[in-house]
Amino acid sequence: MVKTNILSNHFLVAMPQLNDFTFTKAVIYVSQHDAKGALGIIINRPLALTLGKVLEHLNIEIAQPQIANHPVLMGGPIGQEHGFIVYEQESPQGAEILLSASKDMLDDIAKNKGPDDFLITLGYAGWEAGQLENEIARNDWLVVPFNRKILFETPLKSRWQKAAALIGVDINQLSGQIGHA
């Protein structure tokens, strides 16, 4: 059994045999993991929606025209009517990755006063107590240490392969028929 909280600030990389439409080839940033369950955001599933359309819908004026084309991601199957901003913030302990649902932060981003690096998502992935640990034991997920470049700089289409490569795995070489030793 995986200790609780150990998966916070890690990536989950879907194994090739995971055939659930939502999670096929998904990379998830785990924001929170404790005895009650886990919460994560899929970071490589773009929607047919841009930040410009979201800001227009919210009547927020864009001061930075180039952010209008920033992709909006499907963060997960739960609460897809809710948006999240995934961003980095410096703290006395170092850089932290935070989630926000603040309209004020969206306004700051539109005015070029927000974080330099951010993701905009709709929805999230959630697991009840013990559910994620069982999925990991079933070989549904690789657990990969957090890497800021994967989260903010790697092209969306490359994140699945690049995240697995962080732990020396060529995900394309894995069989969909993985068993237990």
From Swiss-Prot:
Q: Tell me the Pfam families matching this sequence.
A: DUF179 (PF02622)
InterPro entries according to UniProt: AlgH-like
Q: Name one GO cellular component term.
A: cytosol
Q: Which SUPFAM superfamilies match?
A: VC0467-like
Q: Which domain of life is it from?
A: Bacteria
Q: Which NCBIfam families match?
A: PRK00228.1-1
Q: Which family does it belong to?
A: Belongs to the UPF0301 (AlgH) family.
* Name the record gives this protein: UPF0301 protein CBUD_2193
